[in-house]
Amino acid sequence: MPAWYDIHGLTFGSTEDEAGIRAAAQSLFHLIQKEIDSGIPANRIILAGFSQGGAMALYTALRYPHALAGILALSTYLPLHHFLEKEASVANKATPIFMAHGDEDNVVAPALGEFSYNCLKKLAYSVQFNRYPIGHSVCPQEMVDITQWLQQRLQK
């Protein structure tokens, strides 16, 4: 199955594929730049993803040098969180972040999502964390909440 990077484990203290994460972020930087080159301003771009894709959305957007419209990260965690304070882009310090997680997620533990949320709050990011009574999936209420959040970000 294709993946953004190798996952060695999804528990606290698991080894992370730093080189793979950084390489995937560079690919996303290039993809964002292609969108900008095609006429879409950075402040109209939202990076979004589920699970490992959500991890890459968080990692990449928080380091991207131009302000984005938002970050949507579902059933995920913040990879290489210990580097964020040093590597973060000032451009996306105020970028709204929507995180959501299932209370019954048996793939990415809800505690990892909550830990990531707390890391972001500690660094004064504009982040909200929503929990839902589901596993590693998306539910109808989550889709309603995502829709409202997206409409708020892109109404301008």
Predicted regions span which residues?
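Amphipathic, non-transmembrane alpha-helical secondary structure
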Residues: 22-29, 33, 62, 144-147, ...
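Short beta-strand/loop motif that positions the catalytic acidic residue
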Residues: 98-101, 105
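Primarily recognizes the serine-hydrolase "nucleophile elbow" in alpha/beta-hydrolase
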Residues: 41-92
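Short, glycine/charged-enriched secondary-structure capping and boundary segments
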Residues: 1-2, 61-65, 85-89, 112-115, ...
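Serine-hydrolase catalytic machinery in alpha/beta-hydrolase-like enzymes
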Residues: 1-44
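C-terminal catalytic histidine-bearing segment of alpha/beta-hydrolase fold enzymes
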Residues: 111-156
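Short, proline-enriched alpha-helix->beta-strand connector loops that line the catalytic pocket
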Residues: 92-97, 123-126
